[in-house]
Amino acid sequence: MGQKVNPIGFRLGVIKSWDSKWYAEADYAKLLHEDLKIRAFLKKRLYSSGISKIEIERAANKTKINIYTARPGLIIGKKGSEVETIKKELSNLTSKEIFINIIEVRKPELDAQLVAENVALQLERRIAFRRAMKKSVTSALKFGAKGIRITCSGRLGGAEMSRTEWYREGRVPLHTLRADIDYGCAEAKTTYGLIGIKVLIFKGEVLPGH
């Protein structure tokens, strides 16, 4: 059976870059765990803000965090009050100086992670999975995606037996390394159990090094 590799990891160093940009030797494991802690904290704290991606850069005792979000206003807060609170909480968590940079995601319909989370939210609101998938596919294509594939796995529609259903429109070339493919996954916590959602969005071809 053919298994699908994570399309972002597969393209690292070709057309995609790393989300953690730092170098360490002896304390590599400690910093890696710190990264995981920061990501988990931000995801939980800012779930309603539509977090697409978190990039972490380190230099000496300073940590710079780039947060890609669909709703920057919610994170910044009134006169930047919310972002200052988050900075303090992260400083307490890591005992390091934290710098936060917020970057707006202009087209959330073309961001795989945000699309996956949106489908998960709809499933939690008891919207039929086929309808939720179709709606996301249509809006992604409308905003300029060359292709999109959404997969839902679990007890769909409350069925006794879990299954996997997917829906694809356009091209999604997984083997072409120059293909700019965005990948995101989310979980919908329904009364019947967890439903996993995976989203692949093909945005066109990029020449390596550009």
From Swiss-Prot:
One of its GO terms (cellular component) is cytosolic small ribosomal subunit. Keywords: Ribonucleoprotein, Ribosomal protein, RNA-binding, rRNA-binding. One of its GO terms (molecular function) is mRNA binding. SMART domains: KH. CDD domains: KH-II_30S_S3 (cd02412). It comes from the Bacteria. The keyword Ribonucleoprotein applies. Disulfide bonds: none annotated. GO terms for biological process: translation. Residues 38-106 form the KH type-2 domain. InterPro entries: KH_dom, KH_dom-like_a/b, KH_dom_type_2, KH_sf_prok-type, Ribosomal_S3_C_sf, Ribosomal_uS3_bac-typ, Ribosomal_uS3_C, Ribosomal_uS3_CS. Pfam families: KH_2 (PF07650), Ribosomal_S3_C (PF00189). The keyword Secreted does not apply. Part of the 30S ribosomal subunit. Forms a tight complex with proteins S10 and S14. Belongs to the universal ribosomal protein uS3 family. HAMAP family: Ribosomal_uS3_B. Binds the lower part of the 30S subunit head. Binds mRNA in the 70S ribosome, positioning it for translation. This is Small ribosomal subunit protein uS3. It comes from Pelobacter propionicus (strain DSM 2379 / NBRC 103807 / OttBd1). The lineage of its organism: Bacteria, Pseudomonadati, Thermodesulfobacteriota, Desulfuromonadia, Desulfuromonadales. The gene is rpsC.
